[in-house]
């Protein structure tokens, strides 16, 4: 049939991770050898995926051995703000979003990108046209405290946004870790707004200066930018306060946090 009939209407990235078996280890050539064996064992599958990446628009394949899908998305795929031409040819900027097929898709929330995990069928329904298919305190300590606090508060099925002056103390890695744990505290996602730390990480991971400038300008203009001044905070349905300074070394255990 005609592949264009089911061409994705939004960009789709298929990241092949958790696939390379460890046949060789402890040698300089171990990685290359393991990836080579992976291709040999699954050649027919990879040939099909290669065809798909050429047959469809808006579809790309990230090969095995590249990294875990959430980290690949964080470092290489996500832009925070996208731009494209509308029907008149004018360039339009719009916020990046991500619908993933894994519960820890929420990791990308740490970059200011709204994203969460759904089932495979639900993801297909989202992109196929016409609904053809239905000091001494670590980031871990903070995460455990956040998880415990949000579990007690009750955020199942909620969108949680982190805000306030304490965010400037959190690196992108810290934010991504907290966002990644959204399934553990029960929220649909744990979102971090775009701010200077977002821009620094985009620059660190090789995003273009043009994309970074667009992200900042768009976020400020549309009200997505995070300010330290509390007078500029959004009005939320419910709020929960956590003083980062009160976080102590923590240890997780059965049912705790």
Question: Which sequence ranges carry the predicted segments?
Answer:
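Fe-S-dependent hydro-lyases/dehydratases of central metabolism
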Residues: 1-257
């Amino acid at each position: 049939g005609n592949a264009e009939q089911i061409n994705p209407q939004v960009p789709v990235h298929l990241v092949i991770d958790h696939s390379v078996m460890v046949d060789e280890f402890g040698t300089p050539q171990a990685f290359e050898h393991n990836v080579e064996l992976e291709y040999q064992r699954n050649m027919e599958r990879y040939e099909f995926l290669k065809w798909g990446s050429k047959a469809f628009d808006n579809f790309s394949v990230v090969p095995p051995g590249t990294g875990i899908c959430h980290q690949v998305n964080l470092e290489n795929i996500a832009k925070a703000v996208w731009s494209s031409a509308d029907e008149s040819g004018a360039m339009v900027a719009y916020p990046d979003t991500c619908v993933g097929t894994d519960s820890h898709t929420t990791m990308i929330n740490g970059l200011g990108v709204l994203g969460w995990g759904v089932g495979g069928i639900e993801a297909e329904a989202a992109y196929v046209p016409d609904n053809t298919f239905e000091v001494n305190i670590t980031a871990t300590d903070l995460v455990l405290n956040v998880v415990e606090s949000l579990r007690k508060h009750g955020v199942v099925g909620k969108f949680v946004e982190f805000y306030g002056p304490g965010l400037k103390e959190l690196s992108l890695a810290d934010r991504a870790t907290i966002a990644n744990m959204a399934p553990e505290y029960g929220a649909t996602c744990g979102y971090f707004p775009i701010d200077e730390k977002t821009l620094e990480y985009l620059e660190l991971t090789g995003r273009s200066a043009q994309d970074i400038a667009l992200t900042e300008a768009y976020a400020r203009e549309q009200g997505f930018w995070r300010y330290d001044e509390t007078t500029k905070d959004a009005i939320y349905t419910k709020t929960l306060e956590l003083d980062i300074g009160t976080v102590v070394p923590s240890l997780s255990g059965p049912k705790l946090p």
